[in-house]
Swiss-Prot record:
Its cofactor is pyridoxal 5'-phosphate. The gene is glyA. Homodimer. Belongs to the SHMT family. It comes from Cellvibrio japonicus (strain Ueda107). Pathway: One-carbon metabolism; tetrahydrofolate interconversion; Amino-acid biosynthesis; glycine biosynthesis; glycine from L-serine: step 1/1. The lineage of its organism: Bacteria, Pseudomonadati, Pseudomonadota, Gammaproteobacteria, Cellvibrionales. (6S)-5,6,7,8-tetrahydrofolate binds at residues 121, 125-127, 355-357. One of its GO terms (biological process) is tetrahydrofolate interconversion. This is Serine hydroxymethyltransferase.
Amino acid sequence: MFDKTQTIAAFDPEIWASIQNEGRRQEEHIELIASENYTSPLVMAAQGTKLTNKYAEGYPGKRYYGGCEYVDQSEALAIERAKQLFGADYANVQPHSGSQANTAVYAALCAPGDTVLGMSLAHGGHLTHGAKVNFSGKIYNAVQYGLNPETGLVDYDEVERLALEHKPKMIVAGFSAYSQVLDWQRFRDIADKVGAYLMVDMAHVAGLVAAGLYPNPVQIADVTTSTTHKTLRGPRGGIILAKANEEIEKKLNSAVFPGGQGGPLMHVIAAKAISFKEAMTPEYKDYQQQVVKNAKAMAATFIERGIKIVSGGTENHLMLVDLIGKPYSGKDADEALGKAHITVNKNAVPNDPRSPFVTSGIRVGTPAITTRGFKEAECIQLTNWICDIFAALEAGNADAVIEQVKTRVASLCKEFPVYAD
């Protein structure tokens, strides 16, 4: 029998200290990592329920374990809400992550050695889009497209040329660091020219898609994948969506279970269902609109201060800051901002002369700061602080400026708490 009065703090003070310290960090630091966000207390609560105890291999109504009648209800709700939210005919809510969702799609639609055409990691793609260090670049013959060096935009002519040359089995559209709107239909047309499947990875913009602020790829692509966190603001996890195609649906289900996973995480699936319901509210659309407004305000301020943004600005929630030619690297900028309690991530930029461990850029995103209540005024102020640190790095007197900015960050964070007590 469990002791219901027992607390984590009393039983495991080391873990409790880690949890508390991370909570403080989230409250006292400004989070600008584009893939991070703060989930609602409801989403967090669902993940701490007794659903975590239940094994449920299989799918609703067709399980390999007994006693699944109630977790079936949770998963069925998650599936129907996902389909409604994104206009999909099919949804699989079991993938544990976006990468595992992508892995399942590769397994369902391609065979080892098949050619896959995806966006280069160095130009804003994702590891699972064919990077050599990833399964997608090891098991499959990965061909990579990128950005036009003059415009900083996806070079659709290059995509078409590569598709005609290599005849891929699947084309992957999507990104982890691209600030403009992708033309899903152009990708569809190119895929149709060569008889390829089209997979869209909308992990970064799923929240914007749900709110109607970014084109919806679900009825254009053969298969669409996403994370359920990032802009969508749900629990950490993945999802697969598709338009009606019974053959592909069967392949996708088999690729997730038993192909790649065993028991689904029912407590996380319940949290996904809650986040999908949250995404159907008017307040959620207001939030996503503010995410884009904040990103545009930050990009404009960077440009005004003489800092280059890849692609010349942003039409979504993120931007890639190009530091090529600066005496400091992306790693230097990341570390300096971290000392001021501003969290970003170093990121390679197109034609980056530095190594992936150093880089010449940083990626900046607005989902988390918008969740805590920042609007354009705070974002402009914050961007100017970042530019002040950049200028100080260039001048060689960063320490004093970092301390000044750190004090201002502390004040701003107190004004905009993430989780008010």
